[in-house]
Amino acid sequence: GIVVYQSPGDIGQYTHEFDGDEWFYVDLDKKETVWMLPEFGQLTSFDPQGGLQNIATGKHNLGGWTKRSNFTPATNEAPQATVFPKSPVLLGQPNTLICFVDNIFPPVINITWLRNSKSVTDGVYETSFLVNRDHSFHKLSYLTFIPSDDDIYDCKVEHWGLDEPVLKHWEPEIPAPMSELTETVVCALGLSVGLVGIVVGTIFIIQGLRSGGTSRPPGPL
């Protein structure tokens, strides 16, 4: 399992990952195991007390590690955020927006959703901190929504490594309506192509009739 504990704030986390994806985490407030997919909990089990004990051990060791480092604070890295839909966007069809925040260190961050500049809390879910190979972290925040051409969305990221909150904007890309001039040009091109096809077809028919007439054997006198 992955244990994270830091101060100030007494912030801790215990998670298990498989192939880069979160398998389960221990809810520290409810003191229970939360599976990412309910089916996992039917196949196996994990005693949340094991996770709580690991966090307590991390808390105990943190003081010694801090002294060994001569109380040198960790370097705050600036996280990077990207927003994208889970599925191709169709107006009026339920979908999910994903805010992927990478290069998080230390693992303390606030991720919030805004719709038309107003905070949104319904339909929001986020993962625990997931570990990268360079020992930084990443996290995903999800927002279920129904796309509308009247709504715009922002993923707001706040972190110690940022001078100010970062907003990652997203809105549905709706094709611009075709102008009357464009429609006229398209119709004219279609008509021209059709006329050319008729003329070429007529020429081929005439040539075919002529070649057929010259090759016909003469009849009896």
Curated annotation (Swiss-Prot):
One of its GO terms (molecular function) is peptide antigen binding. Keywords: Adaptive immunity, Disulfide bond, Glycoprotein, Immunity, Membrane, MHC II, Transmembrane, Transmembrane helix. InterPro entries: Ig-like_dom, Ig-like_dom_sf, Ig-like_fold, Ig/MHC_CS, Ig_C1-set, MHC/Immunoglobulin, MHC_I/II-like_Ag-recog, MHC_II_a/b_N. Its main location: membrane. GO terms for biological process: adaptive immune response; antigen processing and presentation; antigen processing and presentation of exogenous peptide antigen via MHC class II; antigen processing and presentation of peptide antigen; positive regulation of T cell differentiation. Residues 210-221 are cytoplasmic. Residues 171-183 are annotated as: Connecting peptide. The keyword Transmembrane applies. Signal peptide: none annotated. Residues 1-183 are extracellular. Pfam families: C1-set, MHC_II_alpha. The chain crosses the membrane at residues 184-209. Residues 1-76 are annotated as: Alpha-1. Glycans are attached at residue 110. It comes from the Eukaryota. Disulfide bonds join 99-155. Residues 79-171 form the Ig-like C1-type domain. One of its GO terms (cellular component) is lysosome. Belongs to the MHC class II family. This is H-2 class II histocompatibility antigen, A-Q alpha chain. It comes from Mus musculus.
